[in-house]
Amino acid sequence: PNNPFSGLFGGLGHGICDIDTNSLMPMKNGDIVPVTISGVTKGQKGASGELRGYFSSNQAIGNLFINSDEGVYGQLDVSPVEQQALPVAMKQEVKEGPAQILTTVADGEPQYYNVTIESIEYKNSSRVKNLVVLVTDEVLLEKTGGIVQGMSGSPIIQNGKIVGAVTHVFFNDPTRGYGIFAENMVENLVSIEQETVQKAS
């Protein structure tokens, strides 16, 4: 989710963790730079796949200043998707059934792929595993085997609204993964915006 007025945005839907300890990595700030997705390691049962890519520029387009359990948050200098902005759905608007994810897979541009929202958990103690998503799109299944590392933060879209973002893949079934409610990420953005205003005043 991105606020077109302030440039504040949230990404990933989960935190960036230390690979050895699995603990959240501390972060003061960081640059946001463009990347190009150049290849895919296909996911299969018991072996997570991944997107491969490289930094396509060293010119920062924004900065990150929060790494939390529910994603990374920062501010963009210019919105890359301002003309394609979609409204955010409240969690009660999300329904089981057909949806799409918007993701980039080794061909340069983000594409829509069909998925099914299999289940919705409103009371889950984890705020990042609210939805179970099944990839049904034959093109995406052929390219990636389903959900792979690097797809975190891919928007989940239903009825013209952003309902969530992909957060995790099922280790034993790469066609399935979890998603976070977009509303949860927006709540975090609102808190960040309020803190920013308070600091400024």
Labelled PLM ranges:
Residues 1-201:
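C-terminal recognition in membrane/secretory proteostasis and scaffolding
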